[in-house]
């Protein structure tokens, strides 16, 4: 549902080290593939209530037993939410799922987030769960990078989510993944790429073949560590309004390492 789109200056919010990625190729996330079940065990589905049923709207990452990080544009005070942990196939109850209600007063959007200016940055929010997650094989905590950490150009990261399979396309049932190499700020901020739209508190990844799309918003950009693990370096924020995988418009993420202090302060005070 969410994932900000920007056409040149119009974006669209994509409102989108554990287990090896699957090796087969198909066409998902926008030219991604089905993830190995529960291979990204910090991935969550943020769902909103409508007419008595809940529907997937955004992704998120479990960063503490009772805290999830997602995108600011995923949060509306007018909606009722739940978080589903241990999810893989949205259409089937498979057993590991943990459904946790969210209290509206436990939604913490970054104070500088401006819904009318996605390109201004600060597209990040924290959700305090109404009860702690039960950790296990299918539900684990994400690791976050150190404050200020910047990934080198072409770092091979993975986006994960249940976003549309292509622009205006269908939503998948199974969790999707796609390999998105990091595009550093020097390249991503070129005038014929994202220009001044992209800020240093963001991270770009991917290209015109693989990208995030609507429904991936808030989900993680998972990047490898030297010890064989993974860190969540990005929160999926926006793509071009011309299309989810438009040339010279890589997917843009909120750079998690730019907000470590805010994350730690918010959790400590609540």
UniProtKB/Swiss-Prot annotation:
Glycans are attached at residue 114. Residues 1-15 form the signal peptide. It is an enzyme of class 3 (hydrolase). GO terms for molecular function: serine-type endopeptidase activity. One of its GO terms (biological process) is proteolysis. The active site is at 73 (charge relay system), 123 (charge relay system), 217 (charge relay system). Efficient protease with alanine specificity but only little elastolytic activity. Disulfide bonds join 58-74, 117-120, 157-223, 188-204, 213-244. Coiled coil: none annotated. GO terms for cellular component: extracellular space. Residues 29-268 form the Peptidase S1 domain. It catalyses: Preferential cleavage: Ala-|-Xaa. Does not hydrolyze elastin. This is Chymotrypsin-like elastase family member 3A. The keyword Heme does not apply. Residues 16-28 form a propeptide. Belongs to the peptidase S1 family. Elastase subfamily. InterPro entries: Peptidase_S1_Elastase_sf, Peptidase_S1_PA, Peptidase_S1_PA_chymotrypsin, Peptidase_S1A, Trypsin_dom, TRYPSIN_HIS, TRYPSIN_SER. It holds the Pfam family Trypsin. Keywords: Disulfide bond, Glycoprotein, Hydrolase, Protease, Serine protease, Signal, Zymogen. Its EC number is 3.4.21.70.
